[in-house]
């Protein structure tokens, strides 16, 4: 079974920041930057090109809303929104998802060399999760 399906269905733990009947968003286990969030459709689609057209508006609305919240909650200067389609493009988990990656002006080009990613502490995930959830209440 897909790791993202397991998180969506509650079989695996994820630091969920947003959820509705079509979409779930949770913190990336191996963040590129603090606040790196993944937005996934509840239904399993291998990649964005396979998503049912009736799901796309819900997904895009969630990506926008969560991006606003992440940017505000983490006081980021910018946001990168990306999705990889296929192994050659860097897709690792074959459940369609969007990466919301906050950026700051003083940071180097974090995407240029894909800085090494590592799992963070439980305290990190809980702090960021709470900040994003609280910010979403005002969006």
UniProtKB/Swiss-Prot annotation:
GO molecular function, one term: adenylylsulfatase activity
Gene3D superfamilies assigned to the protein according to its UniProt record, in alphabetical order: HIT-like (3.30.428.10)
Residue ranges annotated as motif Histidine triad motif: 95-99
Record Pfam families: HIT
Domain of life (superkingdom): Archaea
Residue intervals of the HIT domain: 3-110
GO annotation (BP), single: purine ribonucleotide metabolic process
SUPFAM superfamilies linked: HIT-like
Protein name (database record): Uncharacterized HIT-like protein SSO2163
Organism per entry: Saccharolobus solfataricus (strain ATCC 35092 / DSM 1617 / JCM 11322 / P2)
């Amino acid at each position: 079974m897909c790791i993202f399906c397991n998180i969506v269905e509650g079989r695996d733990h994820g630091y969920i920041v947003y959820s509705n009947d079509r979409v779930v968003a949770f913190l990336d286990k191996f963040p590129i930057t603090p606040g790196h969030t993944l937005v996934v459709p509840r239904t399993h689609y291998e990649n964005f090109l396979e998503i049912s057209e009736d799901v796309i508006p819900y997904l895009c609305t969630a990506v926008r809303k969560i991006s606003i919240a992440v940017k505000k909650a983490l006081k980021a200067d910018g946001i990168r929104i990306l999705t990889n389609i296929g192994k050659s493009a860097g897709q690792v988990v074959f459940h369609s998802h969007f990466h919301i990656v906050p950026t700051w002006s003083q940071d180097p080009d974090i995407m240029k060399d894909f800085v090494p990613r590592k799992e963070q502490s439980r305290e990190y995930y809980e702090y960021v999760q709470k900040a994003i959830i609280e910010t979403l209440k005002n969006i």
